[in-house]
Amino acid sequence: MTVVGIRLVGILLCVLSLSSCVWNSCRDVKRALSNADEVMWTHPDSALAILESVDTLDLRTKSLRARYSLLYTMALDRNDIFSTDLKVITPAVRYYERRGTDDEKMKTFYYLGTVQHNAGDLQSAIASYIRAKEYSYTPNNLIFKGLISSTIADVYRQNKNYYESMSYAKEI
């Protein structure tokens, strides 16, 4: 083998080992996100711990960043950590506005509304909650459908709009 051939083999081995590391870290991140999603409703503190253990530099694709963003916002809310920072949910909003399932869109807009609500922007929160409601009409979304209607009713009640509040409260 010539010197050029040896160098070429060396470079090829380096590229293969680096791509293997990237692939493994991507697989590990996907596994962590799935684990966090599985325990979100039963053990939200564990979900938050899992998400906080993820190295965000390993979120190399838009879909991974969006999923992490949504799950992290959910975990904060489920642990009664009232985030007002739109930067946390923005990657999910940007991604799921045009892609994703109705379930992902529903959750994204619900949690966008929650962050807006926490920040005191009730008008934007209502718009986001109503948008979330538009994606909640599949049979497997009954819990979220009730949660969305309840939250909309609460926001209208806070604004002393009791008529609208009652109309959404009746949907629960």
How should these model regions be labeled?
Residues M1-V9:
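Bacterial N-terminal signal peptides that target proteins for export
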Residues V3, L13-C14, P139:
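Exposed boundary/loop context
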Residues V9-S19:
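Bacterial N-terminal signal peptides
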Residues C21-I172:
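A "functional boundary" signal
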